[in-house]
């Protein structure tokens, strides 16, 4: 009986020690460092309105249905963060072709002046998470005609807005040139006032 107790005692102590270290101490240290070094990112890169209410995050896409605003990427999960992920079909999968064809038809319905050959791929395909907040500058530019007609804002102003909101690759190396749709639409909203 004593031998069992002598074997179990260190096992229980080690288990409890690692439970406290990995489940409490480490997360608190990492959270503290994140809050000190990059508070905005640690809090989810939230964007607030004039009333200090959260209206979105720079990191999570939103579904903009009003045709006066720029539209983001297609999301098979309807931008529900708790259901993150998409059906990442292989290029040879017929379901991918059907989904893209449906996305093109939906997009053409809202933007009849844009030829199918000029629709950027990021407007008719999902991102891996289904929550991508960014589109390419070209994807924003092809929407200028529609938005200009609906808002009476000159195309030149809208193109300048896109240029002002365009972000380069991270550190000049990683990723593509992109436009955050939420930030772009907030800037557009200021022009509409």
UniProtKB/Swiss-Prot annotation:
It comes from the Bacteria. It is found in: Cell membrane. The chain crosses the membrane at residues 14-34. InterPro entries: KdpC. It is a single-pass membrane protein. It holds the Pfam family KdpC. Its main location: membrane. Belongs to the KdpC family. Part of the high-affinity ATP-driven potassium transport (or Kdp) system, which catalyzes the hydrolysis of ATP coupled with the electrogenic transport of potassium into the cytoplasm. This subunit acts as a catalytic chaperone that increases the ATP-binding affinity of the ATP-hydrolyzing subunit KdpB by the formation of a transient KdpB/KdpC/ATP ternary complex. NCBIfam families: kdpC, PRK00315.1, PRK13997.1. This is Potassium-transporting ATPase KdpC subunit. The gene is kdpC.
């Amino acid at each position: 009986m004593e031998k069992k107790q002598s074997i179990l005692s260190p096992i229980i102590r080690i288990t409890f020690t690692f439970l406290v270290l990995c489940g409490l101490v480490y997360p608190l240290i990492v959270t503290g460092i994140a809050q000190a070094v990059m508070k905005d990112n640690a809090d989810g890169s939230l964007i607030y309105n004039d009333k200090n209410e959260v209206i979105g995050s720079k990191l999570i896409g939103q579904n903009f249905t009003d045709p006066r605003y720029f539209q983001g990427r297609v999301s098979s999960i309807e931008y529900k963060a708790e259901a993150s992920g998409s059906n990442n079909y292989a290029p040879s999968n017929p379901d991918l072709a059907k989904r893209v064809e449906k996305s093109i038809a939906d997009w053409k319905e809202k933007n009849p002046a844009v030829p199918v050959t000029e629709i950027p791929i990021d407007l008719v395909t999902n991102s891996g998470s289904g929550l991508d907040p960014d589109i390419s500058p070209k994807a924003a530019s092809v929407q200028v005609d529609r938005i200009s007609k609906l808002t009476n804002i000159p195309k030149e102003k809208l193109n300048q807005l896109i240029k002002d909101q365009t972000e380069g690759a991270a550190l000049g190396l990683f990723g593509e040139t992109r436009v955050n749709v939420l930030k772009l639409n907030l800037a557009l909203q200021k022009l509409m006032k």
